[in-house]
Amino acid sequence: MENLNRRDLCIALASLATFAAAAQSQSSEHGLPEVMAVPPPPGSAGDPVLDKQRTFPFSALPVVRTANGETRAVTRGVLPTGEAVELHETTLLPGHMPHPAHKHRHSEFMLIREGTVQFDNNGTPELLGPGGVALAASNGMHGLKNVGETNANYFVIAIGRET
């Protein structure tokens, strides 16, 4: 697999912008989707090999606004050691969930940066605040809800493949 170069990155960002514009055109009466889209699983065909050190300035991350808050895709790809990864940041409005509880084959770490969330751990609610981390293990039912009075901000690191 080829390494990600500047040209590939520009094409990927343009594709992401096109996807975001298409998502916004399929909006609710308020101009926003009702539920945040779950990113495609890590390790999908065509994902780049993440074999170069780099930084991801927050101000450069593309923003997709939704009725529940917003998301910022950071990166996705395959590490040289074979693990598929995807990283995004979510801002969740008070009282909202990004989507209903669900499960999938890949695992996810959720790192809470700001706010108070309730992690649905196979039907058992657990509170997490700033600095807290939740692990959604492979095929475990899980979900998040902002139970605080301010926005909740958290990063999701998805590891693994769906097939």
Residue spans for each PLM region:
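N-terminal secretory signal peptides and thylakoid transit peptides that target proteins
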Residues: 1-17
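A short, N-terminal "cap"/entry segment at the start of jelly-roll beta-barrel domains
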Residues: 16, 24-84
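Conserved short histidine dyad/triad with adjacent acidic residue
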Residues: 88-103
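Histidine-centered metal-chelating micro-motifs
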Residues: 97-99, 118, 134, 139-143
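Glycine- and acidic-residue-biased ligand/ion/polar-headgroup-sensing regions
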Residues: 105-107, 111-117
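Short acidic-glycine-tyrosine-enriched beta hairpin
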Residues: 124-137
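Ligand-binding loop in jelly-roll beta-barrel domains
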Residues: 138-163
